[in-house]
Amino acid sequence: ISALQQEESVQFILTTHSPNITSKVKLGKDTDVNSILMCNSDNVFPMGAGYTKLEKKDYKFLDTFLDVTKSNLFFAKGVILVEGWAEEILIPVIASKMGLDLTQHEISVVNVGSTAYLHFARVFMRRSEPEMKVKCAIVTDLDVRPDTENKVQKESEKKKSVEHNLGMPLPNNVKLNLAKEWTL
């Protein structure tokens, strides 16, 4: 796969349900050329720049950090993006205690290893209709701090401030779940 991706005059089509294979294929380019097409709800979603809200820096980041575990997001019916190991371990346990089996519902908890969740969330953000039906939740603490001068703000104001710092409003299928404290 790596060798074929280096060839400019070669086109190949491969269908898979394997995050192992998906992690080896470049997500797309910062052009309309596509390497990955994601199928969901009777629609096909190209990953090229003309279709997603991925930016050039996102493609570069994801080509480096989209490994086998994280590539599972392409096959999930729902995705929970978390910052670290603690959340990756605790969220399925908490869900289970609430009577929800994330695996049975095909919901993937993806540990992005930092506050780099927006690189991954933009995979689900489209430039035009139809909107992707994969629900994506971002669970984060206040590492990305709102612009305040130690003033107490309402929760909605904090979320707006964080979304502003992220550089865009989030579409309906991507939800920011912001902790009230500086750490979870």
Per-region residue spans from a language model:
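Acidic, divalent-metal-binding catalytic cores of TOPRIM
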Residues: 2, 7-9, 22-24, 28-184
